[in-house]
Amino acid sequence: AIILKDAPDEKDLPQMERCEGQDWIGLRIRHKGKITDLYINQLADGRLMHSNSWIMPDGWMTDAYMFAVSYPEGTEAKNAKDFFIAYGSALRRGNETYFSSLAKLFVIQKAEGKKLDLWIDGQPKINTTFRSTKKPMSVEVNDKKIPVVYQKSQIKVKL
């Protein structure tokens, strides 16, 4: 990978390692105490539009074209709260559903303290759920506050 430095003498650059599996390729990026795992689904490039585009990279299960998960170094990916999902309808790990929708969407999820920020695009009407181990005090979708609908570790978003 080519990384552009901000200054010629900059030494603190991200460390990257390639990974791959059946029908997916990926990158693990380590930088400043944070790990970001990025996966590209080689089956979900728009040629297949049905159940054959599911992949299982590193314990995750998704039909997204691309997804990323970020978590602090020294913790496990399954406890991550920050996600990027490109053109996907679900993200699961084991028996846990982290994201579920009847339509393929583009999603960014960022949890900070007791606040959950979501950016969702891809459909005019949204009906989806997101995993949260604790009920957040506030939820914002596309910079607009919405009522918190929380049940059984899932936040429901309907727009």
Mark where each language-model region is.
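Non-catalytic terminal regions with compositionally biased, polar/charged low complexity
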Residues: D6-K158
